[in-house]
């Protein structure tokens, strides 16, 4: 399925998310979240890991049974249209936060947050304001 919003890049906010595989306690709920809600496709998968892709972004997940959700990180996705993406997530049954404007490094961004319930990951989606 083609989507109007383009994911341009990903970077970890307080972790290596997007650069290293993200630990998850169970693969299935995360693969479902990434595909159904976030609009990723499965690029590769085995019993212990999955690679997921949307546009220019690839995320990797690895099963880590002793992963503590309290240590889960956050990541920032640079996207082409936060308003359309937020609506896409609402249509998929998610509950994203409101769009707000924040300043970081002297630049202003329109962004919103979406929390993942399985392992406590927090995703931020933004674009220059």
For the regions a language model picked out, list residue spans one by one:
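Conserved short beta-strand elements that form part of the metal-binding/catalytic scaffold
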Residues: 41-73, 122-127
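Conserved acetyl-CoA-binding loop of GNAT-fold acetyltransferases
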Residues: 37-42, 93-95
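Conserved active-site tyrosine of GNAT-family acetyltransferases
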Residues: 30-35, 89, 120
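A generic "structured core" feature
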Residues: 30-31, 50, 59, 94-98
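A generic "binding-loop/recognition-motif" signal
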Residues: 27, 48, 57, 82, ...
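Vicinal oxygen chelate
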Residues: 1-10, 16-26, 53, 66-129
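N-terminal beta-strand motif that seeds the catalytic metal site of vicinal oxygen chelate
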Residues: 1-31, 58, 73-75, 126-129
């Amino acid at each position: 399925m083609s989507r109007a919003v383009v994911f341009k890049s990903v970077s970890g906010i307080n972790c290596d998310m997007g650069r290293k595989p993200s630990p998850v306690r169970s693969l299935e709920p995360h693969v479902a979240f990434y595909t159904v809600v976030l609009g990723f496709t499965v690029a590769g998968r085995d019993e212990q890991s999955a690679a997921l892709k949307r546009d220019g972004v690839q995320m990797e997940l690895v099963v880590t049974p002793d992963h503590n959700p309290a240590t889960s990180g956050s990541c920032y996705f640079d996207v082409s249209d936060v308003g359309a993406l937020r609506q896409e997530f609402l249509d998929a049954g998610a509950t994203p936060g409101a769009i707000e404007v924040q300043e970081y490094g002297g630049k202003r961004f329109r962004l919103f947050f979406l929390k993942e319930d399985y392992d406590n990951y927090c995703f931020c989606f933004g674009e220059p304001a």
